Amino acid sequence: MQHLEEIIANATTAIDTADSLVALDEVRVQYLGKKGELTLQLQSLGKLPPEERRTAGQEINKAKGAVQQAIAARKDALQRAELEAKLAEETIDVSLPGRRIENGGLHPVTRTVERIEQFFGELGFSTESGPEIEDAFHNFDALNIADDHPARTDHDTFFFNPDLMLRTHTSGVQIRTMENGKPPFRFIAPGRVYRNDYDQTHTPMFHQVEGMLVDENVNFAQLKGILNDFLCNFFEEEVEVRFRPSFFPFTEPSAEVDVKRKDGKWLEVLGCGMVHPNVLRSVGIDPEKYSGFAFGMGVERLTMLRYGVNDLRAFFENDLRFLKQFK
């Protein structure tokens, strides 16, 4: 019988020098296969005297176990090395700057509407909405707008037919809200409105917020106080405000509200007034018992003032270079 120590030494050397799983498997076959050296040693036990077979068999099995253990250890090492090499090829350098996912941002007009809603919401005003295609009653008649008023012409209004049009203001929401409820009322109505006009300070579609408060003993001083607080809050500074007498069919008395700019000039920002008794009557409210005030403002005008934008049309041209300034 060949000396087992020599076989183990040769097998160990072959195992340690195997540089791949294929080479290692060849070593396994060489020593443990059907015709492997250790297998032949086991088969030769029959040639030994009976008294030597037991001891020789134990030695051969011990040698076989040692070779199997060495092969298993080498196989594990080769598999780890192979995996590490594969991972090295596929590795991601986490120190490299990644591709940033660009976050979107709110449109400046949306920001302004939300700011207005937040202020009046804190005063208990709800937010109401209504259809953008309006009928003549809600857009004109119920608001005390005379039949010969210029707003009823094609020059100012987009008509579908004599009784249906794109709303020219959100005042129709005020009428619908009062029709469907009972006083007191305290709400604002933001939304898109449409007028046949287009230049540096006007677009055919723009955004408006109108507000209304109807209750007993409502007066103009309350209106002035709320609007003065709103403008100071909106511009985040104490601004000088003035109320100029004006005329609107749906309010009496009526006023236009100006703020004083840093250059000393006055700029109109909104209109307001006490709700006309005829408007209250049109929705079945007794003007002898209830009074109210209303106000309306162009959102784009306020947005232009807040962010220093000179051309209203820039809000609707979808120029990312412009819009990214407000993120």
Swiss-Prot record:
Binding annotation for Mg(2+): 252
Cite the record's note on assembly.
Tetramer of two alpha and two beta subunits.
Q: What is its EC number?
A: 6.1.1.20
Cofactor: binding details: Binds 2 magnesium ions per tetramer.
Q: Which cofactor does it need?
A: Mg(2+)
What organism is listed for this UniProt entry? Vibrio atlanticus (strain LGP32) (Vibrio splendidus (strain Mel32))
Q: Which NCBIfam families match?
A: pheS (TIGR00468)
Similarity section: Belongs to the class-II aminoacyl-tRNA synthetase family. Phe-tRNA synthetase alpha subunit type 1 subfamily.
GO annotation terms (biological process)? phenylalanyl-tRNA aminoacylation
Q: Give the UniProt keywords, A-Z.
A: Aminoacyl-tRNA synthetase, ATP-binding, Cytoplasm, Ligase, Magnesium, Metal-binding, Nucleotide-binding, Protein biosynthesis
Q: What's the protein called, per UniProt?
A: Phenylalanine--tRNA ligase alpha subunit
Task: Name a single GO cellular component.
Answer: cytoplasm
